[in-house]
Amino acid sequence: CYTRDMLDLKEYGIVMWPEEKIISFREKLLNWYDENKRDLPWRRSKNPYHIWVSEIMLQQTRVDTVIPYYERFLDWFPTVESLANAPEERLLKAWEGLGYYSRVRNMQSAAQQIMTDFEGKFPNTYEGISSLKGIGPYTAGAISSIAFNLPEPAVDGNVMRVLARLFEVNYDIGVPSNRKIFQAMMEILIDPKRPGDFNQALMDLGSDIEAPVNP
């Protein structure tokens, strides 16, 4: 059985909202997202392969830059199998200009894992997705929630900025060990019916917030 340790937020001095306020927050946030979300090509897809490609590209690269690369990459490598079998020269050509080439090499290794360990089918559980090379907790949460509608948080810097503001959290979001605090908060807040949209809504909201709360 796959388990993750639950954090007691009270030990960190964080008091979460009562349930009715959480439900109201979810509703308001998702209404805002429905009205204001950006029309991005990967948001038109629930295909886990498409979501994965977009999330890896977005790790070190601006959204507007990623769009043409994303569309070309899927044109060249439309399936996990085609990525797994791609010649390295063509793979690197598809990535040229994005930099951080280890990202695309890890993606090919992960695609090969999917072919051998998952019979060519993209894993549909958080633990399965997390087992793939180059996929950390954030990316696993994004794919799980967006593609498979699993209530898994996707906690990036933008999300941590929003939570720090909402709950007056003074823990430095730049310290990796503090990520678990925000992860635990998101496990309570996330909308169970629309977890993917909830994660993306918080990311969009956080991208408008320039800095975390000052300690």
Q: What are the residue ranges of the model-derived segments?
A:
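RNA-binding accessory domains that recognize and position tRNA/RNA substrates
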Residues: 8-13
